Amino acid sequence: VFAALLAPAALSIISVTFTVPAERAKAFGVIGAISGGGAAIGLILGGALTEYASWRWCLGVNTPIAIGAAILAIKFVHESKAQGDNTYDIPGVITATAGLFSLTYGFHEAATKGWSSSLTIGFLVSAVFLLVIFVAIEKRVANPLMPLRVVTERNRGGSYLGSLVVGAGLFSMFLFLGLYLQVILGFSPLKSGFAFLPFTFGIIIFAGIASQLLPKVGPKPLMVPGLIFAGIGLLLLTRITPDTSYLTHVVPSLLIMSSGMALVFIPLTSTSLHAVSNHDTGVASAMLNTSQQVGGSLGTALLNTVAATATTTFAAANSQLGEKVMPFAMTHGFTVAFKFSAALLFVGAVVLFFFINIGKESLVETEGASFH
């Protein structure tokens, strides 16, 4: 809950503080690099705690960091409040939360009970109904949770849709690759944490490059090729087997994926806040974060279904492998999921290609105008 409050607030503060697009791009680059560094520390620390203490320690390790950040925020972050109607959209909150829960749980149930299960169908139908009601509410309430003017602008709407698809394709990669490293290759939790460092290093390095290029070339020339590169990196992961080497088959994929995703994340953050008013920056930032998280949840649930089905089918068709069948079946399930993940990233590239129509000139003009 508190992370959901923090992430949009951080992006909103950057947006209203850095009004010059070149400076804002650098600020987003710094955020990207810090996030990458934090991810590296988290993977290693989480692996160490899991291996040498208990996984429960991972749930409390953020407490001292959060306390320190809160103290610094009180000292350095200036308070700001939205003007006008500040009432809270309770009906919107209820229908949106229930709708997204039903959608995610419906995909989850499909993995265990199948798409024809009455429970799966019931949750998915309920999700559609609740989300339609949510949109109807947002059109009528005075202070909507999600003002439609924020998402109906072409570039912002495309950014949120692209973020949803990218989250669906990327988040599941970490799940399946982590399982491959630990279950198939036998990596310890700590070693698995170190194994993801190439991805982190790629994000840190290319986030700085993306922040420098964004004001010069605009967002689309970075995001579309970036997603294509990331998709290629995912496709390279389909070469893995229970006997392949981490250095030759996993590291190159992680480096290609991370370089591509860094070229996406920085411009995507900028386009998601394109031409938005100060009053709506918090909502626009929250939409970006929400679309990523919802995409990750839906993608993980959906691709878990895909991987489980592929694993079961392979095991049934190759029973002659005996005791070796499960490692090969699980790896096959992972590779099928990676193919679907790559397809989602390619779909994201198509979405951003057709929706994003701002160049470097309009990025400067519209963003400069909206904050002065």
Spans of model-derived segments:
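Peri-membrane helix termini and adjoining interfacial loops of integral membrane proteins
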Residues: 69, 312-324
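Flexible interhelical linker loops that connect adjacent transmembrane helices
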Residues: 70-97, 139-154, 215-216, 363-368
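Glycine/proline-centered helix-kink
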Residues: 8, 35-47, 51, 100, ...
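12-transmembrane solute porter fold
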Residues: 61, 105, 118-130, 139-313, ...
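Structural signal for the C-terminal ends of transmembrane alpha-helices
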Residues: 15-18, 74-78, 107, 135-140, ...
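Intrinsic disorder in cytosolic terminal tails and internal cytosolic loops
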Residues: 82, 322-327, 355-372
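Phenylalanine-glycine-rich, low-complexity intrinsically disordered regions
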Residues: 81-82, 97-120, 135-137
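Helix-loop-helix hairpins in multi-pass membrane proteins, especially solute transporters
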Residues: 1-91, 118, 201, 278
